[in-house]
């Protein structure tokens, strides 16, 4: 819970120091952005390089926009700070106030001070990132019923805000790792803990089965036609495909398969993110199939073996990497990729939404190799 008696002068100083440290990076951000914009002008860039550059560009643009927040923050908080100073500098005869029949003067000042603190915090929250809010201890809640929601979720990839939520399971939108938040409370008996753990094990299996279906584009889902239209518009705007009214050299309409020939699943995922369709990240392969006509892999013959392997792998994971307060599970798509390789199935690692950085890849490799070794399975590192 947020402390309503917090010293907002000290807090204001910390916030301004944060902004000033970011402003010092302004020139570096601008130089990097200019470099990326020049690289994006190069023709025939590989799709993955093109998408990585676009993501870096969006990140830097957001950083530069955030730098302008200092002036806006100062304008919005200046009056609040002034009122706060007036309150804390108000002279008060404590002895007289306490011995009088109407000690309302103290109460009124305390109330005004707390109201001013809350007003300041509300403004500050609108300008600060969630990690900074947490570091300043401004992420509290005001009700016991929200206790579970107040527990921060941080994925091992560093993501702390972009998740799909399925009951108490949080699925990272950046790397698909799964986290379950368990409230560590003495009111939960041992039987309840067992039930929660069993439910989590069951849910992990359901998510893995869903992942198998999604890899084959077999999930039952309803995708609004508008999403396809907007994706096509983005692909045209970024010169990845020709406009729908473009003709070939003989004056004939260009076929759908030819128009979308170079469109990859990475393109689809990137533009789903850009358009804000987070709920459809898991439908990337199905959407790609619908747009391009390129059939996804069929792994029905391996499904039973994959599910059996997954049971063994998760059991071993819980034994070796158990966490009392929060249970994390490695990226489900990465697990599917490695289990397919275990069975000699030739699959493309780029078709799996995994491992955004070398550090993340190394972490997953270490965990998976440990699990495979414990189970007597041959592990193959991903290059």
Curated annotation (Swiss-Prot):
InterPro entries: Poxvirus_VLTF3 (IPR007031), VLTF-3_Zn_ribbon (IPR014900)
Protein name per its UniProtKB record: Putative transcription factor 282R
Family as reported in the entry's similarity comment: Belongs to the IIV-6 282R family.
GO terms classed as biological process: regulation of viral transcription
Top-level taxon: Viruses
Record keywords, A-Z: Activator, Transcription, Transcription regulation
Function field: Transcription activation.
